Regions:
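Catalytic machinery of carbohydrate-active enzymes
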Residues: 1-179
Length: 179
């Protein structure tokens, strides 16, 4: 059963928070395709066996006619199921127009006080009809890649690694400050 997951988040962190739920969907339906607004999610999930494909939705705006543009994109995937981890009537309609048989999404008009983890967990459990969905994410990296990194890093001095990030100019400390 070809299944898609729509993650309407531009930041890598918000997308990775949802990875545990994507894995639950993949365990039920097989490897999934993730459609996202995050530029670098594809590279982060390159080694994940439960993720078939990551599609970066580059030019998507929030106008009414964009429903039809998005539906054309979704139609190309031939999904039988799509789970939309966001309360968007626009995305839901685009999926219906694309002819996707089973469209699941958050309740519409419930964006205020939307808790990223609790809402995703409850949505996953309800949609998949499971008792409990883990909230901790498993991150897959191939052994060959880890071995290559270990061989390239010298252990004769102390290392400090900073994992800073920012999704865009509206965040507390804009992304251009990290470049």
């Amino acid at each position: 059963m070809k299944t898609g997951i729509y993650l309407s988040y531009s930041g890598l962190g918000a997308n990775l928070i949802h990875l545990a739920y994507c894995h639950q969907v993949a365990k039920k339906y097989g490897p999934v395709t993730i459609i996202t607004l995050c530029k670098n999610l594809k590279e982060a999930l390159a080694d994940d066996p439960l993720i078939e494909n990551v599609f970066y939705l580059d030019k998507f705006t929030k106008k009414f006619f964009d429903i039809f543009k998005l539906s054309k994109i979704l139609e190309n995937f031939n999904f039988e199921n799509i789970l939309i981890f966001y309360p968007s009537l626009r995305i839901h309609l685009a999926a219906k127009i694309a002819g996707i048989k089973n469209v699941y999404s958050y309740k519409f008009y419930k964006k205020k006080n939307l808790h990223l983890i609790k809402t995703a967990k409850l949505f996953t459990e309800k949609t998949l009809n499971i008792e409990s969905s883990p909230t901790e994410t498993n991150f897959y990296i191939k052994k060959e890649r880890l071995d290559k990194i270990k061989s390239e890093i010298k252990n004769d001095y102390f290392k400090i690694v900073l994992g800073v990030g920012s999704s865009g100019p509206t965040t507390r400390w804009g992304s251009k400050n990290f470049s």
